[in-house]
Amino acid sequence: MSPLRLLNPQSVPVDGTDSHLPAIDPAALTATALRQRFAHPPLWTPEFEGDGRFIAERTAAQAAVLVPLVQREDRGDGGLHVLLTRRTEHLRDHAGQISFPGGRSEPHDAGPAATALREAHEEVGLATAQVQVIGLLPTYTTITHFVVTPVVALVEPMDVSALSLDRFEVAEAFEVPLSWLMTPAHHRRHLFEAEGVRRQFLSMPWQGVGSAGQAREFFIWGATAAMLRNLYRFLRA
């Protein structure tokens, strides 16, 4: 196992939060504003590109994830919610972690968007007709040797508890308000040492209710938190 992999990230001390950074203006988090942002992107640099870039154990595989922004105009928290999943504990890679729907690219996929849409349908039952892709974020290379393209999309309102989950891969699904995730005061920095080098990761612990109907803490960290932070940087640029 790579020394960069953490078996218990919750035990890594919190070095601080990024409360000094401003939250994204709610006016920039509407479906219309996001469509315009991706149609006319600014010049910007992602904050996180992934520690997998530094590991040469094997050739990295292409993958994509869907960043599903569910339209919830009836709620008073900005309207858009991010759909996330908790992976099952028996999986070889990223077991038990919070993730976006997604996975490895297949030869017949037309591109990252096709991969993300296919995987989202397989993992949580999202139909392509429910999803409108609005843009891509820069790739992120995981320590499990996947070069992941985040595909950002708007999703029609649906009942999370009624999603058709692939029970082999997905333990449960849940939503987090996009406005909450785009508030850096909720972004915690953890520091640790690996191979004599000080490294860091972000976490965004969310108290919520999953599709199983139980309230719990969802520990969003690692690649998922890094891609969300890159989305924040994209919207702040």
Predicted regions and their residues:
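N-terminal leader/linker segments that precede catalytic domains of diphosphate-processing enzymes
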Residues: 1-99, 104-122, 126-158, 194-237
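Acidic/polar loop patches that form or flank catalytic/metal-binding clefts of enzymes
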Residues: 161-163
